[in-house]
């Protein structure tokens, strides 16, 4: 009886593989698109039973070729909020997901998929309800529209369907994402390359480096996925963040102080980091002004009601662990 993970060579998918392996699960079918061959690195240390291209997988899954499937973790998508090709985005994120949902419901396979906090757009209420959902870009819209499809399917569903709205996830195995990698990743790379970190300046009433996001460690994201895997009677759409909004300044400072701690140097305050030149700012890009989420913070009420009780890592401990991983991987 297999477990299937789409997007298995991606950031969250590959971390989910690692979490499953730690449980002793190895009968796993990994599904992805390895056109970017370098992403094989995220699979190389995972124990899996098979690999399939995402296009070959779709038809075979619909036919029931894989026998009894314990769960399908659908993590595959185009995750670029800067992608402007709406036709590509809707086919890759929306239509593909719809086909997997339909097949999963017909086969009775638990279906756990990645949604996104991008569905909330520029709003200040991050609750899983239609009135708060106003995406700012076609990526957010593709996730939003599929969530609506799921909401219509849930009342008649005879097997588990779970959507997890990921907030700002950071952690190991994201380097292939380039510009879409986390703030923590880019801060670390800037610091190692240039000896300083540079953040966006003032925008939308927020001071330099003061934009607020809900940053959540990828290890916590994997744990929440496995919580629902362990409780197949629970369905719905749930926020997945830390439940706390932190500034980009705090992320940058956590990275700076983590690197300093690894070099046996004392921590700095934000003011000290700025005055020493380790942290600076640049003008906010004009191209992002109309489609930028300046503030996010997950409302975790529904997730807690669904039985998830574990604490989330603090930003400081999560970033410290991530910086150690990056240093080992250099």
UniProtKB/Swiss-Prot annotation:
Pathway: Nucleotide-sugar biosynthesis; ADP-L-glycero-beta-D-manno-heptose biosynthesis; ADP-L-glycero-beta-D-manno-heptose from D-glycero-beta-D-manno-heptose 7-phosphate: step 4/4. It catalyses: ADP-D-glycero-beta-D-manno-heptose = ADP-L-glycero-beta-D-manno-heptose. Its cofactor is NADP(+). One of its GO terms (biological process) is carbohydrate metabolic process. The keyword Isomerase applies. GO terms for molecular function: ADP-glyceromanno-heptose 6-epimerase activity; NADP binding. The active site is at 139 (proton acceptor), 177 (proton acceptor). It is an enzyme of class 5 (isomerase). Keywords: Carbohydrate metabolism, Isomerase, NADP. Belongs to the NAD(P)-dependent epimerase/dehydratase family. HldD subfamily. NCBIfam families: heptose_epim. This is ADP-L-glycero-D-manno-heptose-6-epimerase. It comes from Pseudomonas aeruginosa (strain UCBPP-PA14). The gene is hldD.
């Amino acid at each position: 009886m297999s477990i299937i993970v789409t997007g298995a060579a991606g950031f969250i998918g590959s971390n989910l593989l690692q979490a499953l392996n730690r449980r002793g699960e190895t009968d796993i079918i990994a599904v992805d698109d390895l056109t970017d061959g370098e992403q094989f690195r995220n699979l190389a240390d995972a124990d899996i039973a098979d690999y399939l291209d995402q296009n070959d997988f779709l038809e075979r899954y619909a036919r029931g070729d894989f026998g009894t499937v314990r769960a399908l973790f659908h993590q595959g998508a185009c995750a670029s909020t800067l992608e402007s090709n709406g036709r590509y985005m809707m086919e890759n994120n929306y239509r593909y997901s719809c086909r997997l949902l339909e097949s999963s419901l017909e086969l009775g396979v638990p279906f756990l998929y990645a949604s996104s906090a991008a569905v909330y757009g520029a709003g200040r209420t991050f609750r899983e309800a239609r009135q708060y959902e106003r995406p700012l870009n076609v990526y957010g819209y593709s996730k939003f529209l599929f969530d609506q499809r799921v909401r219509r399917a849930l009342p008649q569903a005879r097997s588990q369907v779970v959507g997890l709205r990921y907030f700002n996830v950071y952690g190991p195995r994201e380097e292939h994402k380039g510009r879409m990698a986390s703030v923590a990743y880019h801060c670390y790379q800037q610091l190692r390359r240039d000896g300083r970190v540079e953040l966006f300046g003032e925008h939308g009433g927020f001071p330099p480096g003061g934009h607020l996001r809900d940053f959540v460690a990828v290890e916590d994201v994997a744990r929440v996925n496995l919580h629902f895997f362990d409780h197949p009677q629970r369905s719905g759409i749930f926020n997945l963040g830390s439940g706390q909004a932190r500034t980009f300044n705090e992320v940058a400072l956590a990275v700076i102080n983590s690197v300093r701690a690894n070099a046996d140097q004392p921590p700095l305050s934000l003011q000290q980091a700025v005055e020493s030149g380790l942290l600076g700012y640049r003008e906010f890009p004009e191209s992002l002004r109309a489609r930028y989420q300046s503030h996010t913070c997950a409302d975790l009420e529904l997730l807690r009601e669904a039985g998830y009780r574990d604490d989330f890592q603090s930003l400081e401990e999560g970033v410290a662990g991530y910086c150690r991983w990056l240093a080992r991987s250099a």
